[in-house]
């Protein structure tokens, strides 16, 4: 269990510097957007725009999915600093944002509300044509509730793009076999938890991975809530996976030798596909609500 990327520690450091002075006097508007007077120190140290809190390549993949689709209203939750929202806005979409820590948001001109994916988000039913929810499900207490909210908030035929750490690629399977945990879901000692709490200025949820979710669980929750998968993607290829090719070949041979009905029942071909078995750190799923 760790912060996803170094930017999270950078953001947390800025918060530590400014938290007591800025949040004590910041004004909050009715949309839940935190703002500051002109003579007030920055809410976050440094005068810069939003930076991606996800791994490199993830936003590129999401934009590649969205660009061919009709323009519409998108909810980005969790939104982080607003880096993905900025790119979707530039692509012509009407973007709304939501995050458990809305004070992190840095994108001007876009609505930001505070909300928890484990609860009820502050929007009316069927408000959105699209929802992007990247690197959020693994951090929350109740992923099933998040899928119910996706269903409630999307219009019929709406698109959902989600991402989680890929715990089912060949490298992570080996780590689980050898150590009993994966790269993204390590055991946490009391000292580790205290360090995360300090480094992330008390906002533990942005760092702690609480729920490992594999492809099987994602597909189950999607189908249970009326979604049909349109595509499965990886954020990038991992350079060292060639070391596992003999095992990958064996897995795929065993898959081909499995009777067709059992392969279909157990999603064997999907679990042996490149995005899952040879995926990078993150798996991305695009689905449509029927």
Question: What are the residue ranges of the model-derived segments?
Answer:
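S-adenosyl-L-methionine-dependent methyltransferase catalytic module, highlighting the catalytic core
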Residues: 40, 44, 48-53, 57, ...
């Amino acid at each position: 269990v760790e912060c996803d990327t170094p930017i999270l520690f950078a953001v947390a450091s800025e918060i530590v510097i400014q938290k007591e002075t800025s949040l004590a006097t910041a004004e909050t508007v009715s949309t839940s957007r935190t703002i500051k007077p002109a003579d007030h120190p920055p809410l976050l140290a440094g005068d810069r725009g939003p930076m991606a809190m996800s791994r490199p390549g993830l936003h590129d993949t999401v934009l590649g999915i969205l660009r061919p689709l009709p323009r519409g209203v998108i909810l980005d939750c969790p939104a982080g600093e607003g880096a993905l929202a900025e790119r979707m806005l530039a692509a012509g979409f009407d973007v709304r944002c939501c995050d458990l820590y809305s004070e992190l948001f840095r994108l001007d001109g876009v609505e930001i509300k505070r909300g928890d994916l484990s609860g009820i988000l502050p929007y009316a039913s069927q408000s959105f044509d699209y929802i992007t929810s990247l690197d959020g499900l693994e951090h929350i207490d109740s992923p099933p509730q998040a899928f119910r909210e996706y269903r409630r908030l999307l219009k019929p035929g709406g698109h959902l793009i989600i991402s989680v750490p890929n715990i089912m690629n060949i490298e992570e399977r080996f780590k689980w076999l050898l150590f009993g945990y994966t790269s993204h879901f390590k055991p946490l000692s009391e000292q580790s938890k205290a360090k995360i709490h300090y480094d992330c200025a008390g906002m533990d949820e942005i760092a702690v991975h609480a729920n490992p979710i594999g492809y099987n669980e994602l597909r189950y929750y999607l189908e249970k809530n009326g979604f049909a998968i349109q595509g499965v993607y990886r954020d990038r290829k991992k350079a060292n996976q060639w070391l596992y090719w003999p095992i990958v070949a064996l897995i795929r041979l065993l898959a081909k030798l499995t009777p067709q009905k059992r392969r279909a029942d157990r999603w064997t071909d999907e679990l042996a596909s490149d995005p899952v078995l040879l995926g990078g750190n993150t798996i991305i799923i695009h689905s449509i609500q029927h």
